[in-house]
Amino acid sequence: MSKKRLYEIAKELGKESKEVVARAKELGLDVKSHSSSVEEAVAAKIAASFKPAAAPKVEAKPAAPKVSAEKKAEKSEPAKPAVAKEEAKPAAPKASAEKKAEKSEPVKPAVAKEEAKPAEPVTPKTEKVAAKPQSRNFKAEREARAKEQAERRKQNKGNNRDQQQNGNRQKNDGRNGGKQGQSNRDNRRFNDQAKKQQGQQKRRNERRQQEDKRSNQAAPRIDFKARAAALKAEQNAEYARSSEERFKQYQAAKEALAQANKRKEPEEIFEEAAKLAEQAQQVQAVVEVVPEKKEPAVDTRRKKQARPDKNRDDYDHEEDGPRKQQKNRSSQNQVRNQKNSNWNNNKKNKKGNNKNNRNQTPKPVTERKFHELPTEFEYTDGMTVAEIAKRIKREPAEIVKKLFMMGVMATQNQSLDGETIELLMVDYGIEAKQKVEVDNADIERFFVEDGYLNEDELVERPPVVTIMGHVDHGKTTLLDTLRNSRVATGEAGGITQHIGAYQIVENGKKITFLDTPGHAAFTSMRARGASVTDITILVVAADDGVMPQTIEAINHSKAANVPIIVAINKIDKPGANPERVIGELAEHGVMSTAWGGDSEFVEISAKFNQNIEELLETVLLVAEIQELKADPTVRAIGTVIEARLDKGKGAVATLLVQQGTLNVQDPIVVGNTFGRVRAMTNDLGRRVKVAGPSTPVSITGLNEAPMAGDHFAVYEDEKSARAAGEERAKRALMKQRQATQRVSLENLFDTLKAGELKSVNVIIKADVQGSVEALSASLQKIDVEGVKVTIVHSAVGAINESDVTLAEASNAFIVGFNVRPTPQARQQAEADDVEIRLHSIIYKVIEEMEEAMKGMLDPEFEEKVIGEAVIRETFKVSKVGTIGGFMVINGKVARDSKVRVIRDGVVIYDGELASLKHYKDDVKEVTNGREGGLMIDGYNDIKMDDVIEAYVMEEIKR
């Protein structure tokens, strides 16, 4: 017994599968979905349950063409009243009742309606309605035409599909027939596929028939005009009700205001009236406001399908799954065609769309402000056109144009020289001034500038005194006596820390002493260009007299142009002879004031503290004569006395303030270092915050330890101090990398020619005093072209470290006569690049000095022809050049001589020889009457009978 599936039963009955499934469940059948299968008897039972609502298929078939004929007749007739269609329908007592019946009754097949139409009589009410003329329903006509076209396309498509299936079947039959050895299994597979395709085709046809039935069912008509009229009437009624309520509220407010005015006192009436008036205004504003129109209810019903012949769920039951949604372009076009559509606004508002911008008024152009030209312009070399334009407030293009008219091609980023800038300013009528560049890293300018110190603020400052002399002559004892006397005067603490300098007070005035090894430290500072000493105390022992180091100290003081006070020490000894010391010093240029000189002499005994007060008074007297002044109001400048590295404090420097006032936290540049004064201590080891002129202090806070003799200066801020310190360190490094060329006898002429020297500085050391005097007198007599020999220092004894230091400071060389330098001096001379000349014959020293001084004059050379030769044959050698075979006819041809090539009495070439040979041997010269071969450097055009003239350049001796 065969079975049927529920969806097949639904197709036969023309019902939806879910209705059949629901009816089967009502009948008590155990079914799960439309794919469930039932027996034929059960299927007949389910079909019988639908019989009262379903029309028989046999009666529907002959009625279908009749309906189409009637529709065609309706289309062909001219616009009839719409009631004519209703005559064919079953009569109803009223039109509204008819609409309700259509809504309430379930949708029946169209065939049943078609059969019922001719059977129903026309009632008199319908005739009454037909008398009213109605407009033609164009929408219904369009739908009818669309249905007919869909039916025709469907029939054509079905025919084409049948033909295609027949062709495919024949093709498959032919293919299978060609295979003789095909098995039964393949035949069964083919048959199954064919059956499957037939079943799919059958289901498609059934779906199409079902769609046709649904489309033929008449949809209930909706009168949109009546709906709109009813909605509008409802809105008007709502507006009238709201207006009436607001009007009543307004009247009630007015009545309440009137009653309140009658009840209340005059003072209260005014306040209450204001409140009620405000309420009345609010109510009036509400009355005047137009009520918002209610938007019509949105029709949420499903829109009618664009293609009635195509079901949305057509492909849901296929094997490939549901079909993807296609983009509906018709809806996009509908949006574009709407009146208030905004789809193209972005395109219209694009920047380059000229159609939009045609009617727009152009924005007014902002006028440039006119700037007057400045009267003065301060410029620097290398300024660009853009910088000049910004300074004078003009466009760079304008300046470029002016430069072009002046014949200068320039761009706005091109640098201009000072002359061009001045010409440009003349064209504009502006006075141009060149800006004076100030080197911020140059500390020396503070020491030489006249405008740095304020003349009105100058005050007297303490003198700075350096004690010099031979070590055994009592220098150390004198320093100790001065210190002990200071402690004895009651200054508590004494000198607890050695910082290189200290101060004492005499008669209410301060004196600063530098506690340094006299001449050595003095010369080191002199070599660095530092001169901090105001007065020199030269200590000479009365029993020993003038010693070599005493003479050196005298020369150092004279080189620094510092006044000398002679302290004749050890006068308490039995063998003391001060008069002899005065005479010996007079021989070396130190004359006493009693003898008509300018040096003060004081006889003291440092051991027994004798005449120490007189020595200090003499120092103050000399300082008063010098009129030592300083300005304490400016930023501090001075010199480094000594420096060291401390484990706990870092770099510690002892400074001597020469001008201005040094404060704690001042940004400072010391030599090639920089920093900020973090802490400051005086010579007693006490912390101070301020240090005036001629005050020695020890400071911390530097990034590195400076060199003794370096200058220091206080800057405005730490930023400028850092920049100056870094720039000075950079310059020092570059200077160190460059080879420093010292003066020697060979390059003396070049140095003098460059204008670096105006005299020759010499230090003379000899074995005996007579040799020193003779050599000094002989050298000073040499006078060539105004060049003078300056004897910086002359003494008896070996060449020591002090001599090398003095030579390095004075840029001099040392002449040693019958003496030798010590190992330490030789090592220092090599390190400082100081030249030492050693001689044993005096006239050779004089000749060497004369030759060095004559070298200052421009050398004169004279040409001297040494020989002539004639070219007899030429040989051209590849990769070598032309070789000329020659014979010397006069004199000789030397390898180091220059040659001229003379042809027909005309000099063709002048140059040097590349090679000279006699046969195959290289020779230095070829003499008269001999033959040889030569090559000229850089010249190969040698020909026969050319004359080769050999010559040399000889310097004319003076």
Swiss-Prot record:
Span list, region G3: 515-518
Biased composition (Low complexity): 50-67, 157-169, 337-346
Entry annotated with the keyword Lipid metabolism: no
Keywords: Cytoplasm, GTP-binding, Initiation factor, Nucleotide-binding, Protein biosynthesis
Residue ranges of the region described as Disordered: 50-224, 288-374
PANTHER family in the cross-refs: TR-TYPE G DOMAIN-CONTAINING PROTEIN, TRANSLATION INITIATION FACTOR IF-2-RELATED
Alphabetical list of InterPro entries matching this protein: EF-G-like_DII, IF2_II, IF2_N, P-loop_NTPase, Small_GTP-bd, T_Tr_GTP-bd_dom, TF_IF2_bacterial-like, TIF_IF2
Pfam families: EF-G_D2, GTP_EFTU, IF-2, IF2_N
Job of this protein: One of the essential components for the initiation of protein synthesis. Protects formylmethionyl-tRNA from spontaneous hydrolysis and promotes its binding to the 30S ribosomal subunits. Also involved in the hydrolysis of GTP during the formation of the 70S ribosomal complex.
Region named G4: 569-572
Biased composition (Basic and acidic residues): 68-89, 96-118, 138-153, 185-195, 290-323, 365-374
Annotated region (G1), positions in chain: 469-476
GO CC annotation, single: cytosol
Locations listed in the record: Cytoplasm
Annotated GTP binding sites: 469-476, 515-519, 569-572
Similarity annotation: Belongs to the TRAFAC class translation factor GTPase superfamily. Classic translation factor GTPase family. IF-2 subfamily.
Gene name tied to this protein: infB
Name the UniProt record assigns to this protein: Translation initiation factor IF-2
Superkingdom: Bacteria
Molecular function via GO: GTP binding; GTPase activity; translation initiation factor activity
Region (G5): 605-607
Domain tr-type G: 460-627
Chain segments carrying region G2: 494-498
